[in-house]
């Protein structure tokens, strides 16, 4: 899951404008206290049941995942931070039980290609990357939901799996197009949260398009139409190019050994259609306004909560002990083991 955070952030930058190029990554972690040092402030917090994994495992494995993806893809993780916090008082326990990992990065794009183009009728819709599997079903929705709202099995089923080698191949194709004298990309979008439904609908949000489900590559033939359309199998990019440029794109994809699929075309009828000619099914046929024009408005109201905490007792002759405890906190100590 952590590796796909770094991988997804790279794809976000690849999808900037008509294509952009990633340079370096960053990572930030927020968890409750780890239980490593028994003689520190954290030692006063006993082990307890964790909803997911304990903070120590998260900090070690998540950072390993983020760094590992960058190493395999060829992008360094150069900076970041960590915050650990936990406090118990008045029968209340405050802490990060649903941990936070923020993946970020640095990249660049050409100024005159900063805005996406408007697709024309007949333009081809392309998928670059791997096959569809029963992976990451509902991942984006689950990650944004209240902790424990879904069962553990469902939440674990929502975790994506990374494939940095595939992403490198796809990235090389996009890089070749971006660095060309004439970039044929009309519009580009990353695959991630929401799978094909999110990616392909946003590619044609101003025009409409038809997607051939038969043309979407299946790694698992048992997938239902919903699973094919909504899975979040990683390392895929969607783009739109003119029919005359497909030959050039295919040659580059073959050179980089990146799977390429022409899965549909722009229709300019302001409808999004997913159809399966083999099974004579049309699982999705929606007016674009149903997806983009009438999104419900979320109203969030906050209220200030005032809490009073007892003064912390201390003894001046224990000053060095206190300093040692503070320096043992991950939020204070050197963070290179996580961020470099």
Region locations from a protein language model:
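Glycine/proline-enriched, intrinsically flexible loops and inter-domain linkers
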Residues: 1-340
């Amino acid at each position: 899951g952590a590796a796909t955070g770094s991988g997804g952030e790279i794809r976000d930058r690849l999808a900037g404008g008509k294509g952009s190029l990633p340079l370096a990554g960053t990572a930030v972690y927020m968890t409750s206290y780890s239980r490593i040092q028994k003689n520190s402030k954290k030692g006063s917090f006993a082990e307890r049941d964790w909803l997911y994994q304990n903070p120590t495992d998260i900090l070690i494995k998540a950072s390993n995942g983020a760094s590992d993806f960058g190493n395999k893809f060829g992008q360094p993780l150069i900076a970041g931070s960590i915050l650990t916090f936990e406090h118990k008082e008045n029968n209340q326990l405050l802490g990060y039980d649903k941990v936070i990992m923020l993946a970020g990065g640095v990249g660049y794009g050409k100024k005159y290609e900063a805005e996406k183009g408007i697709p024309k009728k007949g333009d081809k819709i392309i998928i670059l990357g791997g096959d569809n599997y029963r992976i990451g079903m509902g991942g984006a929705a689950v990650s944004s939901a209240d902790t424990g709202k879904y069962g553990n099995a469902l939440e674990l089923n929502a975790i994506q799996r990374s494939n940095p080698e595939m992403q490198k191949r796809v990235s090389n194709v996009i890089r070749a197009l971006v660095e060309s004298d004439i970039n044929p990309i009309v519009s580009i979008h990353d695959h991630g949260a929401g799978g094909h439904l999110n990616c392909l609908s946003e590619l044609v949000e101003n025009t409409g398009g038809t997607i051939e489900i038969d043309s979407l590559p299946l790694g698992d033939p048992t997938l239902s139409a919903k699973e094919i359309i909504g899975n979040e199998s990683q390392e895929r990019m969607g783009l739109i190019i003119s029919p005359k440029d497909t030959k050039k794109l295919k040659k580059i994809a073959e050179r980089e050994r990146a799977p390429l699929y022409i899965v549909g075309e722009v229709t300019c009828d302001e409808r999004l259609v997913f159809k399966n000619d083999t099974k004579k099914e049309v699982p999705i046929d929606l007016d674009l306004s149903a997806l983009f024009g009438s999104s419900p408005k979320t109203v969030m109201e906050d209220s200030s909560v005032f809490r009073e905490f007892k003064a912390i007792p201390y003894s001046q002759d224990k000053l060095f002990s206190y300093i040692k405890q503070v320096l043992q906190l991950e939020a204070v100590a050197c963070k290179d083991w996580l961020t470099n």
